[in-house]
């Protein structure tokens, strides 16, 4: 079965540290967590406190060294993008990771629509047990 920890390790290789790029549609982000799309995430309080005392390079180092913040990042990804789809029940780590990564980068509805389209399902944008079962039946 797929495991979140394995998927998270791959995701973290692809997601950066702290960025506040006005040209990025996600706006201010930390490890891929967009403030714009995760306004209520408590990790922003920690980041904002550090921003008062540290500039860019030092800020990235201190954020990455904060164990509580790292735990909060991991929990957000697990709760919002992994557990919501019950990806632990998919046998293929590759398929589970693709669903997870697509959800992180495109949003839940888009990820569901992509999966429905690729599996010949009626495209509703809603997660269903049938879709989960079809994903679970794919062996890579």
Features from the language model and the residues they span:
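Cell-wall polysaccharide-cleaving catalytic domain and substrate-binding groove, primarily
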Residues: 1-140
């Amino acid at each position: 079965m797929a495991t979140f920890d394995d998927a998270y390790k791959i995701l973290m290789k692809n997601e950066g540290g702290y960025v506040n790029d006005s040209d990025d549609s996600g706006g201010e982000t930390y490890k891929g967590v967009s403030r714009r799309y995760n306004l209520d995430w408590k990790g922003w309080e920690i980041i904002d406190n550090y921003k008062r005392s540290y500039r860019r390079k030092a800020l990235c180092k201190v954020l990455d060294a904060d164990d509580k913040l790292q735990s909060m990042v991991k929990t957000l990804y697990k709760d919002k993008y992994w557990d919501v789809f019950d990806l632990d029940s998919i046998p293929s780590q590759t398929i589970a990771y693709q669903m997870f990564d697509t959800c992180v980068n495109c949003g839940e509805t888009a990820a569901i629509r992509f999966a429905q389209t690729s599996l010949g399902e009626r495209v509703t944008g809603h997660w269903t047990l049938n879709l989960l079962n079809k994903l679970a039946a794919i062996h890579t």
